[in-house]
């Protein structure tokens, strides 16, 4: 993972910390939800040229253990502190690894371990993440800084020691599993965050602690082992990108590779306990058939939150491909807008296609609770409102608190329903919510895609689009229009796509979407030069048959751990 040597202004995601920090205190434009506040400008400022400095010693002081405290380094026979300009969890991970203290954790602010004394020796430390020692990272140079001791860096390590060496290995043991006091044994698994015990985020027990599994290389054979270990029948889907929400605690397994016949997940190959390069935004999940009546509708072999959800409907017995009538989402194909039902509206936003979701029932309007509210639900709401495809799902009363009853809760749509009320929910008026949890939707609107809708909302026709609209894609800096850096237009700005998980399948979807034939290559690392502006997508994972890039799995809109040195590109073979 490379980090730019420039200072970023605007919201930025610290790698593996999964939280925003606002560099200039700016607020998001009023027409965008909080989840898209990262679309503020991210101009690149004062170019630093990081230079590694030779030093060997560092320590953490003022904390409860040698693995937690204020960071100090030695230079010229004296200890000094490090300024927190540009400091993030990538740098902290290098320190923790060098000290043999595991992985870095978020540090409470401010001044968790007090202010230092003496010189401030380093500023603008820039690590790439793979360094064995902090001395291999760049900085401004010894004693060059613009800081005070209230900016001293503190580091908090989890003191978790992974299995060494970090190479792919078997986790099997000839010894029988050790049973713990709670009845669970080493290597036990569970599924968390789903609708029942047979679907959810995969968690595994190691040394008495539950932890998650990273989705690198995660697939249906791996999910099959989990389902069988739990007695949950066959695997219906293997999910990625924290489909069932972010876990907490340790990430215990990465690059899991099961043949499918193993009796336990711990018997599959992996990098070893605790060895990974992931964040909880990459938590793996599984959906199993279970022992009761089937509860899933139209699930592919690898489900994505954008395309799929589940219903507790005993009549849903089939498993098959997603209906394709509305998969042409953006850019090259017109959207077939559904007829407005008159029973759903979006209010509180900048227009009729962005706002708080309200539904009509028994002659009165009410709101929808954000429990389980996600992109698939927003897709149905946008369709029912006659507003084209969804761009995002919001919660926590983002578009203001509603009035009147909360009419729907725990909505679970597959994404293909004509009306929100057709989706699974707890029942009219059944909820445990307040209006601070009102759900919302951000829709492109027919006008955003260059479409013209008849007044009854039932038909659409393609019309020219003189300027880019939200969701449009382009390839930049190539020799022709079918090769270049991938850029997406959203929130009145063009932004890039990170190359994490970017592969030929994703490139194939994009080439096909742009009418550019087959994909020849999917280079990363800013092959066509680094872009500017926000990084809009990360961890894009396509199955290959999707008709639009945004139908592929990806991390939520407001999250990435990349910089523009990792911009994704494609080379297509025009047909």
UniProtKB/Swiss-Prot annotation:
Its induction note reads: Not induced by a combination of IL1A/interleukin-1 alpha, IL6/interleukin-6 and dexamethasone.
Name the principal localization, coarsely classed: secreted
Q: Which SUPFAM superfamilies match?
A: SRCR-like
Q: Does the keyword Repeat apply?
A: yes
Covalent S-S links between cysteines? 83-147, 96-157, 127-137, 214-278, 227-288, 258-268, 369-433, 382-443, 413-423, 498-562, 511-572, 542-552
Q: Write down the SMART domains for this protein, in alphabetical order.
A: SR
Which Pfam families does this chain map to?
SRCR
List UniProt keywords, sorted A-Z: Disulfide bond, Repeat, Secreted, Signal
Task: Offer a single GO CC term for the protein.
Answer: membrane
SRCR domain location: 58-158, 189-289, 344-444, 473-573
Signal peptide residue numbers: 1-47
Question: Where does this one sit in the cell?
Answer: Secreted
Supply the name of the protein.
Scavenger receptor cysteine-rich domain-containing group B protein
Source organism per entry reads Homo sapiens (Human)
């Amino acid at each position: 993972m490379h980090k730019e040597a420039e200072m970023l202004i605007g919201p930025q995601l610290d790698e593996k910390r999964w939280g925003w920090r606002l560099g200039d205190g700016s607020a998001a434009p009023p027409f965008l939800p909080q989840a898209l506040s990262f679309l503020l400008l991210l101009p690149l400022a004062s170019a630093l040229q990081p230079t590694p400095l030779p030093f060997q010693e560092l320590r953490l002081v003022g904390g409860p253990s040698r693995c937690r405290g204020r960071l100090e380094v030695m230079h010229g026979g004296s200890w000094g502190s490090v300024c927190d300009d540009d400091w993030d969890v990538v740098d902290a991970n290098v320190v923790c690894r060098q000290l043999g203290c595991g992985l870095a954790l978020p540090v409470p602010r401010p001044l968790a371990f007090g202010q230092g004394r003496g010189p401030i020796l380093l500023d603008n430390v820039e690590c790439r993440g793979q360094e064995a020692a902090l001395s291999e990272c760049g900085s401004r140079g010894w004693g060059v800084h613009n800081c005070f001791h209230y900016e001293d860096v503190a580091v908090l390590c989890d003191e978790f020691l992974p299995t060494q060496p970090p190479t792919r290995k078997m986790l099997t043991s000839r010894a029988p599993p050790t049973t713990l006091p709670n009845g669970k044994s080493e290597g036990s698994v569970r599924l968390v965050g789903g609708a029942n015990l047979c679907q959810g985020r995969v968690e595994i027990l190691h040394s008495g602690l539950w932890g998650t599994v990273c989705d690198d290389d995660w697939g249906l054979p791996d999910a099959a082992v989990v389902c069988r270990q739990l007695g949950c029948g066959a695997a219906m889907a293997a999910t990625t990108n924290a489909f069932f929400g972010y876990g907490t605690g340790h990430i215990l397994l990465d690059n899991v590779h099961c043949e499918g016949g193993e009796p336990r997940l711990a018997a599959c190959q992996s990098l070893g306990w605790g060895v990974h390069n992931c964040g909880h935004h990459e938590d793996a999940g599984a959906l199993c058939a279970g022992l009761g009546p089937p509860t899933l509708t139209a699930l592919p072999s690898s489900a994505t939150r954008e395309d799929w959800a589940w219903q507790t409907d005993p009549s849903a017995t089939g498993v098959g491909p997603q209906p394709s009538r509305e998969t042409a989402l953006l850019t090259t194909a017109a959207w077939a807008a559904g007829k407005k039902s008159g029973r759903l509206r979006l209010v509180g936003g900048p227009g009729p296609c962005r706002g708080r979701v309200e539904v009509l029932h028994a002659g009165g309007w009410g709101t929808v609770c954000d429990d389980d509210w996600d992109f698939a639900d927003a897709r149905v709401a946008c369709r029912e409102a006659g507003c084209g495809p969804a761009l995002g799902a919001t919660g926590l009363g983002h578009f203001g608190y509603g009035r009147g009853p909360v009419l729907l809760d725990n909505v679970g749509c597959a994404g293909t329903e004509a009306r929100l009320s057709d989706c699974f929910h707890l029942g009219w008026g059944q909820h445990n919510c307040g209006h601070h949890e009102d759900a919302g939707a951000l829709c492109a609107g027919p006008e955003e895609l260059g479409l013209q809708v008849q007044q009854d909302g039932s038909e659409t026709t393609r019309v020219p689009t003189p300027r880019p609209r939200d969701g449009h894609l382009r390839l930049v800096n190539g020799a022709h229009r079918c090769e270049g850096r991938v850029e997406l237009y959203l929130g009145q700005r063009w932004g890039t796509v990170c190359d994490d998980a970017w592969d030929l399948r994703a490139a194939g979807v994009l080439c096909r979407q742009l009418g550019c034939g087959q994909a020849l290559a999917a280079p990363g690392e800013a092959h066509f030069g680094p872009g500017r502006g926000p990084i809009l997508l990360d961890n894009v994972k396509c199955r290959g048959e999707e008709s639009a890039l945004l139908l592929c799995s990806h991390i939520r809109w407001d999250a990435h751990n990349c910089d523009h040195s990792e911009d994704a590109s494609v080379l297509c073979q025009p047909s």
